[in-house]
C-alpha cells in the first residue's frame, strides 16, 4: 500500500517508480520532501481521492484514451498499445484497491449503472490495466500544467488547469491572447472529463459571462471582438454539453440575457450556435425557464430598441446561410410549442407571424432542404393542431384565423344583435381616430394589441415578458365579472322596480275600491234599516225619497277614542298653543336666541357682556387670554355659541389651535372692506340723514308689548323671508299655496305672539312707525281674524298629502305581507321541512313529536351549530333545499313585502290616523264657526271647504283599509298560532324578515363554500395533473438526453440538437389535451391552399 502511495505521488514527485511517461520528473519540490510522502502514505484513502480527481489535459496530438462518446465495453481494446502501462506499480495494488479505484474511475466518467454493468464484468487484469493507465493519464495532465505553466503557442500543444483558465480570463487579457485562451478552453471543455468541467464551472461560468458582457458592451466592436464573442459562445455550448453545465447555465440569471443580446444576424455562425442553444433550453429547461428566456429576449430587444423576435426573422431572411435558417426555425418551433396553454401558444406564434414570418413562409417552402422541410412541417402541424383545438373551443366554428377578413366576419357574426355589438362598433370607431401617420399608427396598434393580449390572456397566464415593461397591472377578470353582474343587477332591479310600482298602484287602487265598496255597503245597510223602521211605523209607501244624509262628520264610523297617553304629537290644531309640528314633518328648530340682528342701536353692544369680562380670568390647561382686536370701523357680528372656560377639556381641539399665525394687515383690511356694519355712503352722509335715522334706532330697542325672546325669534323669521308684512298677510288670507310653504307656516305658528299680545299690539296701530320691526309685524298680523286656527288649518292642508303618503304605504305593506304569508306554498313546505328536522333532532326529549312551533323560533335556527362548529342548522336546511327541494327557494321572493311590513309600527300608524281625524274635525269646526270675510283677499273658507271634503274621503278610505289590515293580522295570529295583542306587527314581521335574510345569506355562503371546494378540487386535480405532466416532461427530457446510442451523459446538447433537427423533440408536445373518443367532435373539413403562408378554410 505504501508503494501505491509512492506510485500515485510519483505523478507529482521524484520517487522510484516515476520513469514511465515522464510523469514523475516534473515535480522537483516533492522529490526532496520525504516527510510529506510518508504523511500521504498514512492517509491512503485521502490519497486515493486525490488520485481519482486528477484529469488528463488533452492536446491536439494526443487525444484522451477514454472518450465520452465511445462504447466503454470496448474501451480496453481501443487503447493504443503505446499507452498501456506495464510496470511494477500495477502489481503492488491489491485486488480490493484496484476495484475501488476502478469504481472511482467510472464515477469520474459520469457513467450510470447501465453503463457500469458491462465494465464490471471485464477480467480483473483488464481492470488493473485501465486503472494504471488512468493514473498515468491524470499524472500527465498535472505535468503538462505545472511544468509548462500555460499556453505555449497557438497550436495548443499544452492546456491549462481549470483554475488557471479562470485566473487567465480574470487577468484582463484581450484580442489575440483572449482568442487563444478561449480556443484552448473550448478544446479543454470538449475533451476533459466531467469533473474537470465541474471544477471550472464553479467560477469559470461567471468569468465567461463577464467576458461576453464586456465584449457586448463595447461600442466600437472590431473584428477580433466578434471572433472572441463567437469563441465564448462555443465555450458555453461545450460547457453545457453535460447535465452540470446545463444546470449552471439555467441557474445564472445573466446567461439567457447575454445569449439573447449576442444574437446578431450579421454573424451567421455565432447566431446559429446561439439559437441552437436557446432551442435546446426551451425543450429541456426546468420550470419557469420559458419565463426567463422570454424575459431575456425582451430585455435584449429593449436595449437595442427593436422587436424582440425581429432578429430571428432576420436570420430566416438570409438565404445564403441555410444552416442559420434551419436553426431559426428550430428555435421558433421550440419556443412556440413550449407553453402548455393554447392562448399563449397562439399569442407567441402570431407575434412571429406579425414580425414577418408570415410573408417569408412561402419563400422558405420553396427551398429544397430536408432539415428545413422538417421544421416547416413541424410549424404547420402544430399550428393546425392549435387552430383545431381553438375551433373545438369555439364549438367547431370553421374559420381561417390568419385571414383578417375571415376573422372580422367571424367576430361580427358572433356579436351581431348582441349587447356587445355597440362596443365592437365603438372600438372600431376609435381605431379610425388613430393618427394617419406612417410611423405612429403602427405604434398605436402595437400598444392596443399588448393591452388586449394582457386582458385576454390574463386568466390563463400573462405573457411573462410583460413584467419587463410598463405593465397594466389590473385583474380584469374581477372587473369584467363585476361589470357583467352589475349590468344584470341593474336591469333586473329596473324591471323589479317597474313591476313593483305597477303592483303597488294596482293593489292600492284595489284596497281603496274595497274600502269605498265597504263604505257604500254600510250606507246601504243603514238606509235599509231606516226603511224597515219606517215601514214598521206604518208610514205610507209614497215616501218622497230617502232622508238627507247625516252630516259629514257622522258619515263614517264612530270616531275612535282619544289617543293613549304615549302617542306622538298630533297634527296641528289639536293641541292648544304652542302647538308642536306635524309628526314626521321636520320643523325648523329654533336657533339659540341671538341678539337682535337688525339695525345696531347706539348703546355699546352687546350690553351686559363687558362687565362680565372686566376682571382677569384664569384659563385652564395653560391657555393664554385671546388677543383683543380693535377694528377701525364697526364690524358685523358672527352669531356663534361661545365656549366657556369651564367647558374645556384637556384633549379638546381648542387647546391646540394657534390662530395668531394667520394675522396680517391685508386680511384685516379685507375683512373691514367686506363685513362692515354700515356702508361708506352711510357714514359720509350729513347730519340730516343722521337725524332721520337716529331716533328710530333708539326706539328699536324699546319693546312695548313683546318680550325680548319673542322679538328676537320674530326678527330671525322676518330676516329669513324678507317679504313685506302686508304681502305675508295677503298670502295667508288667500291661502296661496304657490307662495306658502310648510316651513313658513310652521315658523309663524311657532314664533307668533299669543292672542293677548296681538290684541294689545292692535291697539298700537296709530304708533306703527315708532314700533320695532317685530311689533310692527304683530300689528299687521293682528288684523287677521282667527289667525292661529287659520294657520294650523293651512299647515294641515299643506302636509296632508305627505301624511297620506306616509300612512297608506304602511297599510298596504302589512296587508300584502299578510296575504303573501297565507298564500305562499313554498313557505309552508319550508315549515314542514323544519318541523320534520326538529322532531327528528328532538327525539327522546320533551319537545319530540311537536305538532308545530312558535314562529319566532325561525330566527333561532342559526344558533344550532354543527359538530365541527363550521356550519349551522340554517346552512343545512338551505343546502337541502338547494339540492333537493328547489321549489322551497321561492319563498324569499313570495314574501317580498315582509321587509317593509317589519318597519311598520302599529301604534304610530294608529296615532297618525287618530291625529288626522282630530285635525279634520277641528278644520270642519273652524269652517263652521268662521266669521264672514272682511276682505276680498280672504279665501280661507272657499278653499278649505273643498279640501275638507277631500280630506274626509281620504281619511275614511285609510280608516277602512286600516281596519281591514288589523283583521288580516288577527287572522294571521290564528294561522300561525300567536296572540296578535301580545306580538305586535313590527316584531312579527321583523322576525320573519330576519329569518328570510339569514336564509338567503346561508344559501349564498353555501354557494361560496361549494365554489371554494370546487376550486380546491380543481386546484388539486390541476396540481396532480401538473405533477404528472412534470414527471412526463422529465421522462421525455431523460429520453431526449438518452436518445443516442449508449454513452455517458456528457453529450446533452448534442442529443438535444439532434432531437430538434430530426423533429423528435416536437412529436410528443402536440395534442396536449386529449379528448374523450366518445365525445370527440367530427373532424373539421378544411380545404387548404398554400398562399402567402396562410391556409384558407371553407
Curated annotation (Swiss-Prot):
User: Which regions are flagged for Pro residues bias?
Assistant: 543-565, 578-608
Domain GBD/FH3, first and last residues per copy: 90-463
The reply on keyword Chaperone is: no
Where in this chain does the entry annotate a coiled-coil region? Answer: 375-416, 490-539, 999-1050
Domain named DAD: residues: 1048-1078
Q: Which domain of life is it from?
A: Eukaryota
> Which key words are in the record?
Acetylation, Coiled coil, Developmental protein, Differentiation, Oogenesis, Repeat
Q: Which gene is transcribed and translated to give this protein? A: Diaph2
The record's listing under InterPro entries reads: ARM-like, ARM-type_fold, DAD_dom, DIA_GBD_sf, FH2_Formin, FH2_Formin_sf, FH3_dom, Formin_Homology_Diaphanous_sf
Tell me the protein's name: Protein diaphanous homolog 2
Does the record's keyword annotation contain Coiled coil?
yes
Domain free text: The DAD domain regulates activation via by an autoinhibitory interaction with the GBD/FH3 domain. This autoinhibition is released upon competitive binding of an activated GTPase. The release of DAD allows the FH2 domain to then nucleate and elongate nonbranched actin filaments.
Q: What is the lineage of its organism?
A: Eukaryota, Metazoa, Chordata, Craniata, Vertebrata
Amino acid at each position: 500500500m505504501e508503494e501505491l502511495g509512492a506510485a500515485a505521488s510519483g505523478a507529482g514527485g521524484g520517487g522510484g517508480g516515476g520513469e514511465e511517461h515522464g510523469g514523475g520528473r516534473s515535480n522537483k519540490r516533492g522529490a526532496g520532501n520525504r516527510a510529506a510522502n510518508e504523511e500521504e502514505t498514512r492517509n491512503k484513502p485521502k490519497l486515493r481521492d486525490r488520485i481519482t480527481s486528477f484529469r488528463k489535459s488533452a492536446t491536439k496530438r494526443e487525444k484522451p484514451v477514454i472518450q465520452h462518446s465511445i462504447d466503454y465495453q470496448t474501451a480496453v481494446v481501443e487503447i493504443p498499445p503505446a499507452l498501456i502501462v506495464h510496470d511494477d506499480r500495477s502489481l503492488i495494488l491489491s485486488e480490493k484497491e484496484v476495484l475501488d479505484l476502478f469504481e472511482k474511475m467510472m464515477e469520474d466518467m459520469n457513467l450510470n449503472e447501465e453503463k457500469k454493468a458491462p465494465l464490471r464484468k471485464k477480467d480483473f487484469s483488464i481492470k488493473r490495466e485501465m486503472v494504471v493507465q488512468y493514473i498515468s493519464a491524470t499524472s500527465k495532465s498535472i505535468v503538462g500544467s505545472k511544468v509548462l505553466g500555460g499556453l505555449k503557442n497557438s497550436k495548443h500543444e499544452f492546456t491549462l488547469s481549470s483554475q488557471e483558465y479562470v485566473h487567465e480570463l480574470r487577468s484582463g487579457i484581450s484580442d489575440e491572447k483572449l482568442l487563444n485562451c478561449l480556443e484552448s478552453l473550448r478544446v479543454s471543455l470538449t475533451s476533459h472529463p466531467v469533473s474537470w468541467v465541474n471544477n471550472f464551472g464553479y467560477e469559470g461560468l461567471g468569468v465567461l459571462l463577464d467576458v461576453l458582457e464586456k465584449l457586448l458592451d463595447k461600442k466600437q466592436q472590431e473584428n477580433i471582438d466578434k471572433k472572441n464573442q463567437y469563441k465564448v459562445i462555443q465555450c458555453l455550448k461545450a460547457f453545457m454539453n453535460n447535465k452540470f453545465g446545463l444546470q449552471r447555465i439555467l441557474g445564472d440569471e445573466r446567461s439567457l440575457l447575454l445569449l439573447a443580446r449576442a444574437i446578431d444576424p450579421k454573424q451567421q455562425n455565432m447566431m446559429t450556435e446561439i439559437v441552437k442553444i436557446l432551442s435546446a433550453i426551451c425543450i429541456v429547461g426546468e420550470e419557469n425557464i420559458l419565463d426567463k428566456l422570454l424575459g431575456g429576449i425582451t430585455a435584449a430587444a429593449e436595449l437595442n430598441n427593436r422587436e424582440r423576435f425581429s432578429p430571428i426573422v432576420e436570420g430566416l431572411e438570409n438565404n445564403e446561410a441555410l444552416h442559420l435558417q434551419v436553426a431559426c426555425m428550430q428555435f421558433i418551433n421550440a419556443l412556440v410549442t413550449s407553453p402548455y396553454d393554447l392562448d399563449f401558444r397562439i399569442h407567441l406564434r402570431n407575434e412571429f407571424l406579425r414580425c414577418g414570418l408570415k410573408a417569408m413562409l412561402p419563400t422558405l417552402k420553396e427551398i429544397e432542404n430536408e432539415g428545413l422541410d422538417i421544421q416547416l412541417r413541424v410549424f404547420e402541424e402544430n399550428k393546425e393542431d392549435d387552430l383545431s383545438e381553438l375551433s373545438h373551443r369555439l364549438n367547431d366554428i370553421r374559420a381561417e384565423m390568419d385571414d383578417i377578413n375571415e376573422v372580422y366576419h367571424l367576430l361580427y357574426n358572433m356579436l351581431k344583435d348582441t349587447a356587445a355589438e355597440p362596443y365592437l362598433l365603438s372600438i372600431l370607431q376609435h381605431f379610425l381616430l388613430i393618427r394617419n401617420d406612417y410611423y405612429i399608427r403602427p405604434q398605436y396598434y402595437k400598444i392596443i394589441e399588448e393591452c388586449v393580449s394582457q386582458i385576454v390572456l390574463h386568466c390563463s397566464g400573462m405573457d411573462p415578458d410583460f413584467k419587463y415593461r410598463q405593465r397594466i397591472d389590473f385583474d380584469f377578470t374581477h372587473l369584467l365579472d363585476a361589470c357583467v353582474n352589475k349590468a344584470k343587477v341593474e336591469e333586473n332591479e329596473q324591471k323589479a322596480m317597474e313591476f313593483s310600482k305597477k303592483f303597488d298602484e294596482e293593489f292600492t287602487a284595489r284596497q281603496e275600491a274595497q274600502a269605498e265598496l265597504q263604505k257604500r255597503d254600510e250606507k246601504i245597510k243603514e238606509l235599509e234599516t231606516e226603511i224597515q223602521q219606517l215601514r214598521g211605523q206604518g208610514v205610507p209607501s209614497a215616501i218622497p225619497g230617502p232622508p238627507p244624509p247625516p252630516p259629514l262628520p257622522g258619515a263614517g264610523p264612530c270616531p275612535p277614542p282619544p289617543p293613549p297617553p304615549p302617542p306622538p304629537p298630533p297634527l296641528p290644531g289639536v293641541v292648544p298653543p304652542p302647538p308642536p309640528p306635524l309628526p314626521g314633518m321636520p320643523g325648523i328648530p329654533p336657533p339659540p336666541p341671538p341678539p337682535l340682528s337688525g339695525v345696531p342701536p347706539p348703546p355699546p353692544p352687546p350690553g351686559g357682556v363687558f362687565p362680565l369680562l372686566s376682571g382677569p380670568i384664569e384659563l385652564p390647561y395653560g391657555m393664554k387670554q385671546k388677543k383683543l382686536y380693535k377694528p377701525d370701523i364697526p364690524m358685523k357680528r358672527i352669531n356663534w355659541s361661545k365656549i366657556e372656560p369651564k367647558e374645556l377639556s384637556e384633549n379638546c381641539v381648542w387647546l391646540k389651535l394657534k390662530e395668531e399665525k394667520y394675522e396680517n394687515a391685508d386680511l384685516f383690511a379685507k375683512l373691514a372692506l367686506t363685513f362692515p356694519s354700515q356702508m361708506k355712503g352711510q357714514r359720509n352722509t350729513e347730519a340730516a340723514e343722521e337725524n332721520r335715522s337716529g331716533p328710530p334706532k333708539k326706539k328699536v330697542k324699546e319693546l312695548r308689548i313683546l318680550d325680548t325672546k319673542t322679538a328676537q325669534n320674530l326678527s330671525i323669521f322676518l330676516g329669513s323671508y324678507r317679504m313685506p308684512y302686508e304681502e305675508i298677510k295677503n298670502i295667508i288670507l288667500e291661502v296661496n299655496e304657490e307662495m306658502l310653504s310648510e316651513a313658513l307656516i310652521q315658523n309663524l305658528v311657532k314664533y307668533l305672539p299669543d292672542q293677548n299680545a296681538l290684541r294689545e299690539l292692535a291697539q298700537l296701530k296709530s304708533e306703527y312707525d315708532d314700533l320695532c320691526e317685530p311689533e310692527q309685524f304683530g300689528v299687521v298680523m293682528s288684523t287677521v281674524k282667527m289667525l292661529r286656527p287659520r294657520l294650523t288649518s293651512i299647515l294641515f292642508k299643506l302636509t296632508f298629502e305627505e301624511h297620506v303618503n306616509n300612512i297608506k304605504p304602511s297599510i298596504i305593506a302589512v296587508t300584502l305581507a299578510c296575504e303573501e304569508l297565507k298564500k305562499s306554498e313554498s313557505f309552508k313546505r319550508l315549515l314542514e321541512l323544519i318541523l320534520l328536522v326538529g322532531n327528528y333532532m328532538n327525539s327522546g326529549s320533551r319537545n319530540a313529536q311537536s305538532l308545530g312551533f312558535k314562529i319566532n323560533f325561525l330566527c333561532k335556527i342559526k344558533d344550532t351549530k354543527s359538530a365541527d362548529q363550521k356550519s349551522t342548522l340554517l346552512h343545512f336546511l338551505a343546502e337541502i333545499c338547494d339540492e333537493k327541494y328547489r321549489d322551497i327557494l321561492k319563498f324569499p321572493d313570495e314574501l317580498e313585502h315582509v321587509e317593509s311590513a317589519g318597519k311598520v309600527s302599529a301604534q304610530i300608524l294608529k296615532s297618525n290616523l287618530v291625529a288626522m281625524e282630530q285635525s279634520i274635525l277641528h278644520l270642519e269646526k273652524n269652517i263652521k264657526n268662521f266669521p264672514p270675510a272682511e276682505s276680498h283677499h280672504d279665501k280661507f273658507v272657499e278653499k278649505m271647504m273643498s279640501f275638507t271634503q277631500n280630506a274626509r274621503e281620504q281619511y275614511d278610505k285609510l280608516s277602512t283599509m286600516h281596519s281591514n289590515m288589523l283583521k288580516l293580522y288577527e287572522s294571521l295570529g290564528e294561522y300561525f298560532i300567536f296572540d296578535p295583542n301580545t306580538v305586535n306587527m313590527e316584531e312579527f314581521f321583523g322576525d320573519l324578515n330576519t329569518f328570510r335574510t339569514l336564509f338567503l345569506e346561508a344559501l349564498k355562503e353555501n354557494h361560496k363554500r361549494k365554489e371554494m371546494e370546487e376550486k380546491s378540487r380543481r386546484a388539486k386535480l390541476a396540481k396532480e395533473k401538473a405533477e404528472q405532466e412534470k414527471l412526463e416532461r422529465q421522462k421525455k427530457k431523460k429520453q431526449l438526453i438518452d436518445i443516442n446510442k449508449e454513452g455517458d451523459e456528457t453529450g446533452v446538447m448534442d442529443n438535444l440538437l439532434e432531437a430538434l433537427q430530426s423533429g423528435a423533440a416536437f412529436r410528443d408536445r402536440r395534442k396536449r389535451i386529449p379528448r374523450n373518443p366518445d365525445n370527440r367532435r367530427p373532424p373539421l373539413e378544411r380545404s387548404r391552399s398554400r398562399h402567402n403562408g396562410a391556409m384558407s378554410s371553407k
